Amino acid sequence: MKRAKILLLAIITLLPLVLISCGGATQTTGGWSGPIVEDGIIYAGTRDGRVVAVNVSSRKLEWEWPDTTGLRSLIYTTPIVHGDLVYVGTYSGQVYALTLDRGAERWVYPRTGSIGAVVGRPVVVNETIYVASSDGTVYALDATYGDLKWKCELEAGKLWTSPTVMGDTLYVSTLDGHIYDLSLETEGLLGWSFEAEAGFASSPVVYEDDIYVGSFDRYLYAIEIGSNASMWKFPQQKPAGNWFWASPIVNEGIVYAGCLDGRLCAIEARTGEKLWEFDAGSPIVSSPVLMDTLLIITDESGTVCVFDVSTESQDEAVPLRTVSIGASVRSSFCAQNGLVYIRGEDNSIYVVDIEIGEIVEGWPVSLAAQT
């Protein structure tokens, strides 16, 4: 436990430096909010603390929040669209609900003050928005009005990851190396927790009865829910070259995990056996995305790689296509209908057609504002 506390202090101290120079880059870091696409509109947080809504077809800026006179805060959370609202958490410690059509502020929680930095993306389930905050508390807010339904204070210190909801249970991983389960019905801890020797870098991913999560000790953990011991840690022989910062994804019994050492690994979910790996040559900060049988990753250098996971791979995978957007990428991205939407660290939005392997759109957010 003492080692975990020492590692936690080191992580909090070094993390801003890692985010600024994840792969040797020298830019000043802003938020790492990624884009989402809903009904032909891209919603994204920008490096300068705005939320923008941009029409994909016309590149027209539909709205931005706050306006040029508003107070801005760093935005690390990717927006969420639910009903007629878009939700976003800020590093200054508020959660905002904005109208889809105009970006008008519907509500803010808390009304005054701060709940501590919101770094992990909130989730919305059954008209409730769940927020993990750096004050060590999970908040449940009414999605329509922003009223507090309940909150649960953990003995975990900072929460910088996104909560995961499966059924009537919420799971959250912490910077001090715990995973907790909370009941959405009784609005409190269920009693099980898992403790590792280092903090968890990624949000927990639930697949069947197991949790998969990356740690600052440079291992990826597989944990059976309810157990106090891990099923396996990956790599099996020695730690990886860096952190498993991005959350993995699991599909048909295979875990796909990107690492800051630049490697993408396919791992057998039950045994932890490595099936294949790919060396991107640059840190993988964003979680992979699966579209049908195509697995998509971006690395910090701005290269998009596409793999066909329906084919057998031996030891080292070879991507079907690679495309460089020419800008570094540290935020999540989204994919739909054969297109990948990326927000670069140059504050531009890129659209990549993965079928032809080309950038079909790319424009600065500032240009959209002038259109």
Please state what every model-predicted region is.
Residues 22-38, 64-80, 105-125, 148-166, ...:
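Extracytoplasmic beta-rich repeat domains
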Residues 9-18:
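Bacterial N-terminal signal peptides
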Residues 49, 93, 136, 177-178, ...:
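Short coil/turn segments within WD40 beta-propeller repeats
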Residues 1-9:
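Bacterial N-terminal signal peptides that target proteins for export
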Residues 55-59, 99-103, 142-146, 183-187, ...:
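Short loop/turn segments that connect beta-strands within beta-propeller blades
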Residues 46, 90, 133, 174-175, ...:
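Structural signature of WD-repeat beta-propellers
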